[in-house]
Amino acid sequence: MDTIYYEENRNTIKRALKKNLDMSFLEIVILEKLNYLNKEKIDAVELKKHLNIENTPISVQINHLSDLGLFKKSRDVYDERRIFLHDIDFSKIKSIIKQYHLIVDTILSRKS
């Protein structure tokens, strides 16, 4: 995919994601990373490190994705600040990622 062409259409893609999937771009990135890591359980801090976004809060996105039933979240028994994501539904995640790529491909093919 041509990066410059993608960037030129980034706002259109963001609007389409919100309209069709009710998700933000960051939520798609989080799902892509969860799918890539393929772990049954992951600490939210570890996920942030893998995303390379230590200074960006992702709690709103985590809550939204959890509300959609893509995974469950729970607090650590000994340290309430730690949040674990578990029971990750990889089949739903893969389906959403596939829809994302379809949306992007459709937008980029219409613009060319």
Language-model segments: which ranges?
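N-terminal leader segment of winged-helix/HTH proteins
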Residues: 1-21, 68-70, 85-87
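Amphipathic alpha-helical dimerization/coiled-coil segments
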Residues: 14, 92-112
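N-terminal helix-turn-helix DNA-binding core of bacterial DNA-binding proteins
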Residues: 15-54
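Short, cationic-aromatic polyanion-contact patches
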Residues: 21-26, 43, 76-99
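Canonical helix-turn-helix DNA-binding module
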Residues: 41-83
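Juxtamembrane helix-loop transition sites at the ends of transmembrane segments
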Residues: 43, 54, 90, 105-107
